[in-house]
Amino acid sequence: MGNVCIGPRRNFAKNGLLGILRPRHAAPSSPSQPTTTSRSIPVVLPSAPSSKPPPPTQTAPPVPVVISEPPPPQPQPEPQPAAPSQPPPPQEQPSPPPPASSNTTQQPPPPQQRQQSRAKKPAHIKRISSAGLQVESVLRRKTENLKDKYSLGRKLGQGQFGTTYLCVDKANGGEYACKSIAKRKLLTDEDVEDVRREIQIMHHLAGHPNIISIRGAYEDAVAVHVVMELCAGGELFDRIVRKGHYTERQAAGLARVIVAVVESCHSLGVMHRDLKPENFLFVGNEEDAPLKTIDFGLSMFFRPGEVFTDVVGSPYYVAPEVLKKSYGQEADVWSAGVIIYILLCGVPPFWAETEQGIFEQVLHGTLDFESDPWPNVSDGAKDLLRKVLVRDPKKRLTAHEVLCHPWLQMSGSAPDKPLDSAVLSRLRQFSAMNKLKKMALRVIAENLSEEEIAGLKEMFKMMDTDNSGQINYEELKAGLERVGANMKESEIYQLMQAADIDNSGTIDYGEFIAATLHLNKVEREDHLYAAFQYFDKDGSGYITSDELQQACDEFGIEDVRLEDMIGEVDQDNDGRIDYNEFVAMMQKTTTGFGKKGGHNFSGFRDALKSHS
């Protein structure tokens, strides 16, 4: 479930508003992990404000924005206090009660405006009067018992829907974080679907160095447990509070990480929708510790051109088009721009005493580049912010264009242009694999859970425009173009041939999943062993040429040289493949043909991530 979302409240809790509203001398919070709190309710805005509010540095009060649950009552204008020339001293106040949730739909429509309608009650959910929903199964599959594999330790964080604990792997002593979501608190069908989608998205984004990695999801009668990477270094939020603001070089380095995450999400068809400093954690306490993005509770799968209407996010970071209830993935870029602004000066670009005032400033306020420390900030940084914090999303830079901006290249470590998309990179690596490895990935893909491949399923449907269950050359070409992957026709043809394992001339669903699967899946011993057993038909512990021929027949692969296939993997030259040789082949890093950019993503999948 998501963190804190826009809603009718007066309290300014740390998780809901910028940490700048806390005193800069305040002690940083303890190391945190993603928690589960409330979702959003609609924000009702006047169709036309009576007058344009002054910039934050002026003293005239902002025109209030009315926040109410629909149908909205007729608002009575209330005078607002005059905005001070600088943000007021921060105050910690209790977190607000959770607002009512907005509706979402699981199946995305064609690239048109998404209608928010209440989903029908699934058959596996029973409604009871005293406890909202009685959920029989959230994950819709039987899972292992969490406590058979992990020991739960101290509490790391608390949210509206659940609690995050330290957990230890009983097998190897590794430390992780476990977010336990209480099923009794999932009051609506949408709450249940949101939990499923968050897990699906975490699996879909797996492997990115700056996105928190998921270890697995478990379910018992009481809760859904999500085990993930432990980030013990605390929030980016707290470091901003501690520092006041970063040096320009430090800010550029963090900005690159944040925007690269946004670009990767967009290229894989995911919109985060709640980017803010609280949702970035450091792995450790070191100054140069890696930064990880967390909390995908408000995130959605999207298709190019799709329009969303539900108002979600956090007040200081929400894009103006979100408040106007018509937005797409460009809203994430606005939120990233707000974070960059804060990194450079320590205060948000649009602020006021109340949420109503904040929303009005987001819609109509003026960027302040006059107050300290802006006279000492480079023109390049200000140029980037002017191009990111532009209210017309069509004129706003994309995440890819932000990464290519000269200011983010000032340290010399910016990515080369053009960047590969996440999917294009995976496609290219897949194309360079030997046939045995491709077949093994197909076996692994067919045994993955629904939540692990849900994102890839959405991408397949996006590319399969005629709903035939097959992607032909023209559909692959159009799909790559939609996500900004500019490729020569010869390259696309090579990718097509590489993914088409059975040489049918098209890419079917199973071939697409295998080719776009992130290779972190092959790190799991159970996946590797299951794949090896598929080829080792007689259970002898070896894959022989006869067994390999049988597997090729099952996959419809003809004209193969079995000796060459075995020879590529057979390290001891005994004419067969044992389990250790098989694992070495599967875990060997593969470099795709003509690979550009610095991505370490794998296979066919990265073909869809170039210019978001």
Swiss-Prot record:
SUPFAM superfamilies per the record?
EF-hand, Protein kinase-like (PK-like)
Positions with a binding annotation for Ca(2+) 4: 570, 572, 574, 576, 581
**Which residue range or ranges hold the Protein kinase domain?**
150-408
Top-level taxon: Eukaryota
What reaction(s) does this enzyme catalyze?
L-seryl-[protein] + ATP = O-phospho-L-seryl-[protein] + ADP + H(+); L-threonyl-[protein] + ATP = O-phospho-L-threonyl-[protein] + ADP + H(+)
| Catalytic machinery residues | 274
Q: Could you tell me which residues belong to the region Disordered?
A: 23-132
Lipid-carrying residues in chain (N-myristoyl glycine): 2
Quick one: where's region Autoinhibitory domain? 414-444
Where mainly located?
membrane
Q: Which SMART domains match?
A: EFh, S_TKc
Binding site residues for Ca(2+) 1: 464, 466, 468, 470, 475
Which compartments does it reside in?
Membrane
Q: Where does Ca(2+) 3 bind?
A: 536, 538, 540, 542, 547
EC number(s)? 2.7.11.1
| Membrane association type | Lipid-anchor
Q: Which GO terms describe its cellular component?
A: cytoplasm; membrane; nucleus
Please provide the Gene Ontology terms (biological process) for this protein.
Answer: intracellular signal transduction
Q: Keywords for this entry?
A: ATP-binding, Calcium, Kinase, Lipoprotein, Membrane, Metal-binding, Myristate, Nucleotide-binding, Repeat, Serine/threonine-protein kinase, Transferase
Compositional bias segments (type: Pro residues)? 51-100
Record-annotated EF-hand domain positions: 451-486, 487-522, 523-558, 561-592
| Free-text note on domains in this protein's UniProt record | There are 3 contiguous domains conserved in the CDPK subfamily: a kinase domain, an autoinhibitory (junction) domain and a calmodulin-like domain. The autoinhibitory domain (414-444) inactivates kinase activity under calcium-free conditions.
Designated name of the protein: Calcium-dependent protein kinase 27
Organism, by scientific name, is Oryza sativa subsp. japonica (Rice)
Name the gene. Answer: CPK27
